[in-house]
Design a protein with these regions (language model features):
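Short linear sequence motif anchored by a di-proline
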Residues: 1-176
Length: 176
């Protein structure tokens, strides 16, 4: 599960990528630090013209039962479950991050990040709603070192995988 992640919008890599897409942080999107469910996240997605664009997405979607907030979806089943299938096929997104947190058995928060500290993307899906566009982060079975702490981890993508994740459903299935 991924319930909190870290992003530094002052990072030169973040600024370079997002500036090239004409993005300027606004008051509506949380600026930096730890991001938690219900916050607006700066995200990459395809616009209606099929171009990569920056979009503010609210993290979390009401559960089908109407009770609770879904913040993650299992990558193994997201393209087969009716509740998620259309979102996976048509509305994938990328959420920039510098790290994510998991909690160990003693409820101690542990930060996982790249060894070089570079930015990466969390793979997600989003849904257009009347009020806000909402997103979920996709997870998979954890691999070391995360598996020592938790059984799930977010889908993590390198910058070079971004375009394929957003534009190619078959490639996205492979990454998931």
């Amino acid at each position: 599960m991924c319930g909190r992640f870290q992003l530094d919008v002052n990072d030169s890599e973040f600024r370079s990528i997002f500036k090239s897409l004409n993005y300027t942080p606004t008051n509506s999107v949380s600026e930096s630090g730890d991001f938690t469910p219900s916050l607006l996240l700066p995200s990459l997605c395809l616009n209606r013209n099929g171009k990569i664009a920056v979009k503010a997405l609210k993290w979390g979607l009401s559960a089908p039962s109407g009770k609770g907030l879904l913040i993650n979806a299992r990558s193994e089943t997201v393209f087969t479950k009716p509740f998620f299938r259309s979102d996976f096929e048509n509305r994938r997104c990328l959420i920039p991050a510098h790290g994510f947190y998991e909690w160990d058995a003693e409820k101690k928060k542990i930060l996982f990040k790249r060894y070089d500290g570079a930015m990466f993307f969390l793979g997600g899906i989003f849904r257009r709603l009347e009020t806000d566009d909402k997103c979920l982060i996709l997870t998979r079975s954890a691999r070391p070192p995360v598996s020592a702490v938790h059984d799930r981890e977010p889908i993590m993508l390198e910058i070079k995988q971004a375009r394929a994740w957003l534009t190619n459903t078959d490639a996205a299935k492979e990454y998931a």
